[in-house]
Amino acid sequence: MHVTALHVRQFRNHKEYRCRLAATVNVIYGSNGSGKTSLLEAICLAYKGTSFRGHDKDMVHRESEWYRVSMSDTTNIDRVITFDNRGERARKQWTVDSKSTARLPQKFRYPVILFTPDDLRLIDGSPARRRKYLDDILSQLNPTYHTALRRYERALVQRNRLLKSRDVSSDQLFPWNVILSESGSMVISTRRQFVKTVNDSITQKYQQIAGAANKDEVSVEYTAKDTSAHALLSHYEDCFERDRLQGYTTAGPHRHDIQVSLRGTLAENHASRGEVRTIILALKYIEADMIAAQFGMSPLILLDDVFGELDSTRQQHLIETFNNQQIIITSTHPIEGIDFAHQIRLAEG
C-alpha cells in the first residue's frame, strides 16, 4: 500500500493544500515555517490515528475553527478526518470506507515509522524517553506487551498510592507486588528480546547508512538484571522499607534504561551529531523490518528534516536503505543526485 494523494484544509498553517505522491521516494522541500512537518502530521493522523505534535485545537488554522484532512491510497479506500470546534462541543470524525466513527478503527490503522529531530534526544535524553521508545514500538508490534504494560502501570499507581501512607504494611502491598511481578516479568523479557534482535543487525544497518568503508560497531544494552516473576516479587518485598520511606516504588521496569554504545563507548558521551542521527535511523530501519516481518506489510516511512548533519554519502545511502518502500521526506532544499525521487516544492503560506 502507498499513499497516492493528500488534501488538507484549514490545517495548521495550510488554508488549503493538495499534492500527489509517488510510490517510492518523495521529498517535500521548502523554507522553515512553510508547513512541511504539518503534512507528515496529517499522514500520521490519517493512518496511525494520532498526531505526534499536539491536540486537535492546535491543528486548526489560526483563522479557522475547523480542519479537514483527506488521503487516497492504492487500497482505493479514502480516508477523511474532520474536526469542528464550533458550537458547545468540539467534534472529531473519521470517515473511512464510507463509514464514520469518532476514532480510527483498529482494522484501518496502518503502521507508520516516524523520524523527527526530537528523536535525536533518545541517545542523551532521560531514561524515561528511552523507555517510551521501547514501549511505543513494542506496543505496536505486540498487543500482549501493551496489555501487560497497562496492567503494570495501573498496579504501580495503586502501590505508590499506598506507599504515601505512613502506616502502610507489607501485607497491604502484597497483592500489588504480585501483579507488578507477573506483568513486569513479561515487560522485561519482551524488552530484552527486542534489544537482542536490535543487536543482531544494528551494526550492519549503521554501516549500510554510513557507507561501506565504515567499520564502526554499535551495541544496545538493557539495564535490567532480574527477569522472572519470582525474582521480581522477592525484590519488591525486599525493598519495602526503602519504598515506604521514599513514598514510591523505587525499582522495576518503570525505572529501567537502555544504553547505546558506538565503538565500545557510550554514544551519549562520544558520538557526533551525525553519528547519533545515523544510529537513530538504523533503529528506524530495524523497526521497519520488524513491522514488515510481523504484519507482512511495509510501513509508511515519514522522515522529518532527516538530512541535517548527514553528509551527501549518508543521504544517498539512507535513501537506498529504504528502497522499494514509500518514503516521505521533508527538507529545506531539494535533494541532489537522486533522480528517482519525486520532489515537491512547498511555497510558504
Where are these regions (language model features)?
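Conserved NTPase motor "head" modules and their coupling/switch loops across ABC/AAA+ ATPases, GTPases
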Residues: 1-31, 171-182, 186-300, 309, ...
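Walker A/P-loop NTP-binding motif
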Residues: 44-49, 286-290
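Nucleotide-state sensing region of NTPase/ATPase domains
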Residues: 45-129, 138-141, 145, 199, ...
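Long, charged N-terminal accessory/stalk domains
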Residues: 121, 132-174
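A short helix-turn-beta junction within AAA+ P-loop NTPase domains corresponding to the substrate/partner-engaging
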Residues: 339-349
